[in-house]
Amino acid sequence: MVGTFYRAPSPESPNYADVGTEVGPETVVCIIEAMKVMNEIKAEARGIVTQALVENGKPVEFGQPLFKIRPL
């Protein structure tokens, strides 16, 4: 396990990226917590989020896809 996947900065905050959200290379889409450090993860491509592939609070591995993004 690399870390824990979080869709929002806190439980009370809205998700960084939901289905239908337009994202680009500078858009933060989630946070991965590793060793008590919160790492902002940015989209790797420009497009529209079509699916979140990981549930909030679940462990993730290096290289694991987190979202499906339809290119614009």
PLM features per residue range, with description:
Residues 1-72:
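Structured functional modules or segments
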